[in-house]
Design a protein with these regions (language model features):
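Sec-dependent signal peptide recognition
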Residues: 1-8
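C-terminal motif of bacterial Sec signal peptides marking the signal peptidase cleavage site
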Residues: 11-13
Length: 461
């Protein structure tokens, strides 16, 4: 993995030229922000705090976008984004610190490793073997790319690497799980036979370790949104840009302004749900055609009392990777709860075809098999559907074969002076993360002329 040699602040400053005489200095400026996710709320918060007339249009009946904190039984669970991936030089952590919000070190305890093929719980040696496979494969990525070329998928690289290592049987199965699930289908949320080998594991990584927002991301989102002019249940369907204004059609209304900032996910832009007049440039539409959205889903299961011991790693005997991880979040959620994660091939297979009851039953069957016991009926359950959500189109962006970070950079470019874009997919070094969404909102607020950010916690950004 490449690590940045520049502080995140310097990187952001290089990407966001400041213009103290720009639109933010004009009292007639009115910015319409499309989307009340972290990117949109960050931009709106910074603009509003700088005195810029700003309105946010949100399609859903809630704010937060792909952050969504809800309760399952007596437990509070993040059903979308759930971690701060690194807290050093992270604007999300800086904002939390400035707002008096807290976060805790992720202390997930993996106590159960179950291999369905051998019908056995595995011990420390198996964990070590998977760690070694992960480190070995990622360490050999450059050589694999040279050997296999630009059209190779991670699955191609995995097969070559396992063959080169002479692995077979259980050793090959453990290595496959580490590469397919840890590296790809839970990290990038996409099928291992679609993610391009060329750019996998090339993003910059913030230091400081993974942390979990205390009480969930909901408190962070509420702090961003406080006092903002937000219209819920306003899905945007059309954006028209003229020489001196913008018109945005939403929920049968026409909202006018001087600038519009579009922060919807790649999945929404690709769907054509929003029409643009004039049409988006060929550069942007071609970039969108190469990018895609991953599919990471969660099934949250709560009980009145915990019956398990720690978190579970489940190695499916099938290639689809059904329910590979269950996190015990009881300590941070305020009640006994397991959250199962699944992505990539399995998520695509079941989303839109299985009912919620079937998804829950499948998760309980995995737990029963792994723990070799009857599982009590949960007191409450909740199943996510990011894959089929029309306002998301998936979980977050990934790079299939043929896509590159240049496509993410193309998404970040304005179309003229009045149509701007933000979102996790517009930050090529950190895409797929909440901090990327916040970075992009800050970038566009600066582009609109906010020189000095006064929002508590973000003054240095």
């Amino acid at each position: 993995m490449r690590l940045s040699l520049l502080p995140a602040l310097s990187l952001l400053a290089c990407q966001t030229p400041k213009d103290p005489t720009g639109p933010a200095a004009d009292p007639d400026t009115r910015v319409i922000v499309v989307g009340a996710g972290v990117a949109g709320l960050t931009a709106a918060r910074v603009l509003a705090d700088a005195g810029v007339d700003t309105v946010v249009l949100e399609a859903r009946d809630r704010i937060g976008g792909r952050t969504w904190t809800d309760t399952v039984g007596g437990a509070t669970v993040d059903l979308g984004a759930a971690w701060l991936h690194g807290v050093d030089d992270n604007p999300v952590a800086a904002f939390a610190d400035g707002q008096g919000l807290t976060y805790s070190k992720d202390r997930t305890r993996w106590s159960v490793l179950y291999d369905e093929a051998s019908d056995a719980q595995l011990g420390d040696a198996a964990w070590t073997a998977m760690d070694d496979a992960f480190e070995g494969f990622t360490g050999d990525l450059d050589d694999l790319r040279d050997d296999l070329g630009e059209d190779a998928t991670v699955a191609d690289g995995r097969d070559r690497w396992i063959d080169d290592q002479g692995l077979s049987g259980k050793d090959a199965r453990l290595a496959t799980h580490a590469i397919d699930q840890w590296l790809v289908e839970l990290e990038y949320a996409a099928p291992v036979d679609e993610v391009g080998l060329t750019w996998v594991w090339e993003e910059e990584e913030l230091t400081g370790g993974d942390h979990i927002p205390d009480g969930g991301y909901g408190g962070y989102v509420d702090a961003l949104a406080e006092g903002l002019d937000i219209a819920l249940d306003h899905p945007v369907t059309a954006i028209t840009v003229t020489d001196d204004s913008v018109e945005v059609e939403a929920a049968g209304e026409t909202v006018t302004g001087t600038h519009v900032l579009v922060t919807v996910p790649v999945g929404v832009l690709r769907s054509g749900a929003i029409t643009f007049d004039p049409p988006l440039s060929d550069t942007k539409t071609e970039a969108l055609s190469r990018l895609d959205m991953g599919n990471l889903e969660k099934v949250a299961l709560s009980w009145d009392e915990a019956w398990w011991d720690g978190s579970l790693e489940f190695i499916s005997a099938d290639a689809d990777g059904a329910y590979p991880e269950f996190y015990d979040l009881s300590d941070v959620a305020g009640g006994p709860v397991l959250v199962g994660l699944y992505g990539g091939r399995f998520a695509r297979a079941v989303q839109g075809t299985w009912t919620d009851d079937q998804i829950v039953d499948g998760a309980l069957a995995v737990l029963a098999e792994a723990y070799n016991r009857e599982i009590p009926t949960p007191s409450d359950t909740l199943v996510t559907h990011w894959t089929t959500d029309p306002y998301a189109g998936g979980s977050y962006t990934y790079l299939p074969v043929g896509a590159s970070p240049d496509d993410l950079d193309a998404l970040a470019e304005p179309e003229g002076d009045r149509l701007l874009f933000a979102g996790e997919a517009t930050v090529s070094d950190h895409y797929g993360n909440v901090h990327a969404a916040m970075m992009s909102g800050l970038r566009e607020a600066h582009r609109l002329g906010v020189e000095d950010v006064v929002t508590a916690g973000l003054e240095d950004w």
